[in-house]
């Protein structure tokens, strides 16, 4: 839960290593388990939410032989849109985040499903979004705070 950029992720199978999991819990004090979605090999979508509104998304595709879509793990970003289901999920989450006074977040969707965590401390991908779309969401965020 404190990790970022695809770090501290274990892929467990039916033959998972109990000692490996025990060491992980001992080191980090907790473990979050998420169902593996096979379609991750086709990429995930990082959705950017600013002040409760969906502002855009990028598709992140893992490098060959990897299950991690993170750019820092070798994933590649592509321009993308959101389908109705993805937009609905993202909008609902955005409203909830705004109620909790979280003004900037990134959520990750695979095949239309939220994969578990909401990135509020490290919602990366803005440089790639700007490169692909020309839109500067970082500037939009800071301008939207009205700190002048």
Show the residue positions of the predicted features.
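Short, histidine-centered active-site or binding-site loop motifs used for metal coordination
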Residues: 1-2, 122
């Amino acid at each position: 839960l404190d990790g970022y950029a695809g770090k501290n992720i274990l892929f467990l199978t039916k033959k998972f290593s109990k000692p490996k999991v025990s060491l992980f819990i001992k080191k980090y004090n907790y473990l979050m388990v998420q169902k593996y979605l096979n379609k991750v090999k086709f990429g995930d979508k990082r959705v950017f939410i600013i002040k409760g509104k969906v502002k855009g998304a990028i598709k992140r595709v893992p490098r060959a032989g990897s299950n991690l879509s993170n750019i820092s793990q070798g994933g590649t970003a592509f321009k993308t849109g959101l389908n109705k289901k993805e937009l609905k999920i993202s909008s609902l989450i955005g409203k909830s985040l705004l109620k909790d006074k979280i003004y900037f977040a990134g959520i990750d969707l695979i095949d239309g499903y939220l994969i578990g965590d909401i990135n509020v401390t490290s919602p990366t991908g803005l440089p790639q979004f700007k490169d692909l779309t020309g839109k500067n969401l970082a500037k939009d965020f800071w301008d939207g705070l009205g700190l002048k």
